[in-house]
Amino acid sequence: MMILVTGGARSGKSRHAEALIGDSSQVLYIATSQILDDEMAARIEHHRQGRPEHWRTVERWQHLDELIHADINPNEVVLLECVTTMVTNLLFDYGGDKDPDEWDYQAMEQAINAEIQSLIAACQRCPAKVVLVTNEVGMGIVPESRLARHFRDIAGRVNQQLAAAANEVWLVVSGIGVKIK
């Protein structure tokens, strides 16, 4: 079963995703964040301390289909947090050292879509419950920069693909989860 949990920043989506897991004794937590500065290091440490000790944590943001596969114990639950951070990391990885104004966003989106399609296929083959957390990016103003506009567009299309493939979709607003699929 594939479940997508979406919502704005600080909406309570992580808490809601963890509630969907319940008291499962076998959890694979896939963290997609990278430590790029002190503020992000503090955020990651805060999340680490909040997780139960028995959760198995893997910090990775590429080739996630290799972690989510048909050999996973059906009693295990997979929690991937967060898809939007994964998309951000992929964008900057594909962009390399080039100036973002020189990036080939169409080629980048194709590469990201290939990664997302592999992730979806893995989730659908996986016998365990897979919960994906993502940010709802399309409810704000039109971003000022080219990079931010492309990011919003790519992340929005990724979310649409995930929602279409998911068995359940939850939108979390102000700490309240609303099942929309």
UniProtKB/Swiss-Prot annotation:
EC numbers, comma separated: 2.7.1.156, 2.7.7.62
Superkingdom, natural source: Bacteria
Matching CDD domains: CobU
Keyword Kinase: yes
Reactions accelerated catalytically: adenosylcob(III)inamide + GTP = adenosylcob(III)inamide phosphate + GDP + H(+); adenosylcob(III)inamide + ATP = adenosylcob(III)inamide phosphate + ADP + H(+); adenosylcob(III)inamide phosphate + GTP + H(+) = adenosylcob(III)inamide-GDP + diphosphate
InterPro entries from the UniProt entry: CobU/CobP, P-loop_NTPase
Binding site for GTP: 7-14, 31-33, 48-51, 59, 81
GO molecular function: adenosylcobinamide kinase activity; ATP binding; cobinamide phosphate guanylyltransferase activity; GTP binding
Pathway: Cofactor biosynthesis; adenosylcobalamin biosynthesis; adenosylcobalamin from cob(II)yrinate a,c-diamide: step 5/7; Cofactor biosynthesis; adenosylcobalamin biosynthesis; adenosylcobalamin from cob(II)yrinate a,c-diamide: step 6/7
Induction: By cobinamide.
Pfam families in alphabetical order: CobU (PF02283)
Keyword GTP-binding: yes
Enzyme class: transferase
GO terms for biological process, alphabetical: cobalamin biosynthetic process; DNA damage response; porphyrin-containing compound biosynthetic process
Residues annotated as the enzyme's active site: H47 (gmp-histidine intermediate)
Coiled-coil residue spans: none
Alphabetical keyword list: ATP-binding, Cobalamin biosynthesis, GTP-binding, Kinase, Nucleotide-binding, Porphyrin biosynthesis, Transferase
PANTHER family: BIFUNCTIONAL ADENOSYLCOBALAMIN BIOSYNTHESIS PROTEIN COBU, PTHR34848
Known role: Catalyzes ATP-dependent phosphorylation of adenosylcobinamide and addition of GMP to adenosylcobinamide phosphate.
Family: Belongs to the CobU/CobP family.
Oligomer status and interactors: Homodimer.
UniProt-recorded name of the protein: Bifunctional adenosylcobalamin biosynthesis protein CobU
Taxonomic source organism: Escherichia coli (strain K12)
Taxon lineage: Bacteria, Pseudomonadati, Pseudomonadota, Gammaproteobacteria, Enterobacterales
